[in-house]
């Protein structure tokens, strides 16, 4: 079993619990170069809000250096996804770390989203 399969297997129980709660899900994906955050509908069929280090606004705030793979960039993405969610009328979400450890970039994104007003 490789790392990706292990991570996806770790994510299954969390996603099952979130599906039972019937709340919006803040899903995080972390690659070596970028971080992505999506808020998914309770039914799980639509992405309502998204933000990533690929967005022009985030890249401009980072200084154009293209450094999307650090905790500072993750915090900007967390703040941005929270702002977009509040504009869409979403305040309560369940945090889906997608099998990634709650450490480093994933933690920075979550804490920034909380500080910007998302509740989870």
UniProtKB/Swiss-Prot annotation:
What InterPro entries does the record tag this protein with?
Ribosomal_uL18_bac-type, Ribosomal_uL18_bac/euk
Name the family. Belongs to the universal ribosomal protein uL18 family.
The protein depicted here goes by the name Large ribosomal subunit protein uL18
Give the multimer and partner information: Part of the 50S ribosomal subunit; part of the 5S rRNA/L5/L18/L25 subcomplex. Contacts the 5S and 23S rRNAs.
User: What UniProt keywords apply to this chain's record, in alphabetical order?
Assistant: Ribonucleoprotein, Ribosomal protein, RNA-binding, rRNA-binding
One annotated GO molecular function is: structural constituent of ribosome
Q: A Gene Ontology biological process annotation?
A: translation
A single GO CC term for this protein reads: cytosolic large ribosomal subunit
Q: Which Pfam families match?
A: Ribosomal_L18p
Q: What does this protein do?
A: This is one of the proteins that bind and probably mediate the attachment of the 5S RNA into the large ribosomal subunit, where it forms part of the central protuberance.
């Amino acid at each position: 079993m490789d790392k990706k399969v292990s991570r996806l297997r770790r994510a299954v129980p969390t996603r099952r619990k979130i599906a039972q709660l019937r709340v919006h899900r803040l899903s995080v994906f972390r690659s070596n170069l970028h971080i992505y955050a999506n808020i998914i509908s309770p039914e799980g069929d639509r992405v309502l809000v998204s933000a990533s280090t690929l967005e022009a606004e985030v890249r401009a705030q980072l200084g154009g250096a293209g450094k999307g793979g650090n905790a500072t960039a993750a915090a900007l993405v967390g703040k941005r996804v929270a702002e977009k969610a509040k504009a869409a009328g979403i305040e309560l979400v369940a945090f889906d770390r997608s099998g990634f450890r709650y450490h480093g970039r994933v933690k920075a994104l979550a804490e920034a989203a909380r500080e910007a007003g998302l509740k989870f």
